[in-house]
Amino acid sequence: EHARIRLFWASAEQGMYGETRPAVFEGHLGAEVYVRPSPLPVNGDRLLRDTVVYLTCLHESGHALGLAHTAVFEDIMYSFQYGGDFNEYFGRYRRKLETRADIAKNPGMSAADRARLVEILKR
């Protein structure tokens, strides 16, 4: 209950895959992260569904920590407002996985994402 970043599973009726909203908890700035997990496999592929949910959680958590969108397709903070191939964005990560446990071995952040996060956390 004291966490400054809180994750919520959003319903399909909310019409979002992921969204981060600023919030104040006990007088401290924080964030509410909303992610809509699909209950069904994407194109019959459960690992692709897990990929979309994981990368969306990671992206939205990045916002909660202060990371902004980038125009670099390799970054987790990439925004599709710049275009880009949705299927390839998630597919390149999915191709690294044989099982759900492989997600723990493949963090999904680029070196640039990590460098920006380190700079934010130093402040």
Predicted features along the sequence, with ranges:
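The catalytic-center signature of Zn2+-dependent metalloproteases
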Residues: 47-122
